[in-house]
C-alpha cells in the first residue's frame, strides 16, 4: 500500500543515467505510450521564469538553446510572480502533509532533522482557508497556461537559478536557497504537466 504525502502532487517518477533507459521505463510505466516527433516551433522559453537567473547560468542556458535549436520562441507564461507560485505550491503541499503525515509524526515522534522539522511546523499553521485560496490560484494559473501555450508546447528552462550551494551553510541560509529554487521546480507540479530534469550546466565553481 502506498500512503499519500501530498495527493495534489504525489506522482510517479524515475531516474536514469541515459536517455535510452529513460524511454524504456516510460513505456513500462505509462499507459497508451505513443512516440511523437517534437517540432522546434513547439519548444518555448518562458521569459518570466528565467528573468532573474544567475548571470552565468542564464548565459549558458541561452548559449545552449542557440547552439541546439536556434531562435526559440519566447513566451510570457503567467501573470503571477514566481514567488506567488512557489507559495501556492508550499501551502497546498503543506496542508496535505498536515492531514496525511503529521498525525503519524505526533503518534510515533520519530527523530527528524531540524530543517525538516521546521517545515512540519510551518505545515501545522496552514489553515483550510489558506489551502482553498491556494487551490483557486492554482486553477487560475492552469487556466492561464491553457490560454498562453499552444497545444503540444514544450517549455525549456533551468530548474535552479544558480549552482548547488556550498556544503556547511546554516539551516536558515539553506532554507532561503530552497525557497528560491522552489520558484523554478514548482511549475511542473502546479501545472499538472510532466517534466524531465537533466543536469546540464555548471556554475562559476563548476558545481552542477
Residue ranges and their predicted role:
Residues 132-208:
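Glycine-rich, small-residue loops and helix-cap segments
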